[in-house]
Amino acid sequence: MEVLLHKVCGQPESRTMTLRAAGPEDAAAFYALQNEVRAAMPHPEQFVPDTLENIARYLKEDLCIGGWDGERLGAYFILRYCGQDAHNYAAFMDIPREEWDGWANADSAIVHPDYRGNGLQRKLLEAVLTLLRPGIVGIGATVSPENQYSLNNALASGFEIVCRREMYGGYDRYLLAMALSVTFGDTSPEGRGTGVSVKPMLNE
């Protein structure tokens, strides 16, 4: 899938980026991009990094899309099929365990600063949705409340806020959900349209 880049490094540009399914051979590039982007964040704690070994496993077992500018990886999206694993975000949304197999985790969406401003997070998600495993009815995600850029992108893409809670051993996160059997667009934190009950916000 080819997408048009309107700017690169903050300057007007007109060239294409290739979005394609990635495999284990791309693990080193994914890992390097993760670390480069995290190191440049004003608050690196907003993003919990993965190990090279975990990324290689995701690339083998799950759905991973890379955005390539020639030979350079400029963006990626990792969607995990967690099934009955306790790490499935469905476990935190009061979804019955027998339905967990129908939910996937939007694990991470990374865009290098050179390529921001092209709507790549949304375009990567759109590419992922065309390649989903049959039977997936919803996607869960987490975003740091301090990461307004990613939160706005997620809401604009159809995710809705389910709750705010501690995750990953004490990190403050919004838990988001996208139900694939509804028409999206209602991104208010009331939870309408997801079929998932909204829980109270942390400390409210």
Where are the language model's segments positioned?
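Conserved GNAT acetyl-CoA-binding A-motif
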Residues: 132-144
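Conserved acetyl-CoA-binding loop-helix of GNAT-fold acetyltransferases
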Residues: 108-111, 117-130, 152, 156
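C-terminal "cap" of GNAT-fold acetyltransferases
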Residues: 6, 167-187, 198-204
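A short, internal acetyl-CoA/4′-phosphopantetheine-binding micro-motif in the GNAT/acyltransferase core
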Residues: 94-96, 106-117, 143-144
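A short beta-loop-alpha structural element at the N-terminal edge
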Residues: 16-32, 43
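Conserved acyl-donor/pantetheine-binding loop and adjacent beta-alpha core of acyl/acetyltransferases
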Residues: 78-108
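Conserved active-site alpha-helix within GNAT-family acetyltransferase domains
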Residues: 145-164
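Active-site rim helix/loop that mediates acceptor-substrate recognition in acyltransferases
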Residues: 42-70, 78
